[in-house]
């Protein structure tokens, strides 16, 4: 264990082998972060004293200018090699609501939702305790150093069930391995829960859930929580590339009687497709127009989709604090 000193904060500790981000959050420190995967750069810090090892030296969250300075690092992608003194602007909103822990989990069910999207259910010994819309870092012993962030699609439960909708990324390392080794009884490790874009039940507004690709997991969790905890109408918009990528809602066990679902594709390659065609932010805009500020809005998906949707929402007058999002890098 190494000591972690952040200017203006009480000292904490860095666990051996844990990322600096996970260690800081486990100490109750409001360390800023977003994707926890090396892509967004929100967890960047300045190293004042000590040594760290980068788990992903080429992570896109660091700019070339950051690398030239030599003392800028991503907390989600480095581990401590000594006592550390760092500089970062901590914020209370990042202090974990639920304590973060590392858990061993068993794969209990794997189902194909589409040709490249799996529903994977894991079970831990203790209860599955998390907020709707949060995510976990997932690891496999067979892939040392490979850590991926996936949102839970289900809700907290005493049975210890954690469900994820995982999309195959052909150029990735974790998802292709999982698709090829998708067998019940396999062991994985979860670290979490993490994420600050969770469901807010007390706003009094209707919920609008928007997902693209693997963002379905996040959008489904928010929709499930909203239907359970409020009596307000819930809308879910989901965008795919082609009709082949579209999901059947019966396969993900979501109650369409209480939920208005709109599924769109960007490439209409099937003459039988009857849904809207276009980018999902355009479909949402056309469907809801000037009523968008009436909603509490939750969205997740690839960064270009999230960026385009946020710009559209702000342009429609939606207050920034009514928009909650996760971008999957």
UniProtKB/Swiss-Prot annotation:
Q: What is its EC number?
A: 1.18.1.2, 1.18.1.3
The cofactors it requires, by name, are: [2Fe-2S] cluster; FAD
List the thermal properties of the activity.
Optimum temperature is 30 degrees Celsius.
A Gene Ontology BP annotation from the UniProt entry = carbazole catabolic process
Assembly notes: Monomer. Carbazole 1,9a-dioxygenase complex consists of a terminal oxygenase component CarAa, a ferredoxin reductase component CarAd and a ferredoxin component CarAc.
Protein name, UniProt field: Ferredoxin--NAD(P)(+) reductase CarAd
Q: Where does [2Fe-2S] cluster bind?
A: 35, 40, 43, 76
Q: Which reaction is this enzyme known to catalyze?
A: 2 reduced [2Fe-2S]-[ferredoxin] + NAD(+) + H(+) = 2 oxidized [2Fe-2S]-[ferredoxin] + NADH; 2 reduced [2Fe-2S]-[ferredoxin] + NADP(+) + H(+) = 2 oxidized [2Fe-2S]-[ferredoxin] + NADPH
In this chain the FAD-binding FR-type domain maps to: 100-200
Q: Which UniProt keywords apply?
A: 2Fe-2S, Dioxygenase, Iron, Iron-sulfur, Metal-binding, NAD, NADP, Oxidoreductase, Plasmid
What function does the entry list? Part of the multicomponent carbazole 1,9a-dioxygenase (CARDO), that converts carbazole (CAR) into 2-aminobiphenyl-2,3-diol. It can use both NAD and NADP as electron donors, but NAD is supposed to be the physiological electron donor.
Gene designation: carAd
The pH note for this entry is: Optimum pH is between 7 and 7.5.
- Classification via SUPFAM superfamilies: 2Fe-2S ferredoxin-like, Ferredoxin reductase-like, C-terminal NADP-linked domain, Riboflavin synthase domain-like
Q: Organism's domain of life?
A: Bacteria
| Catalytic class of the enzyme | oxidoreductase
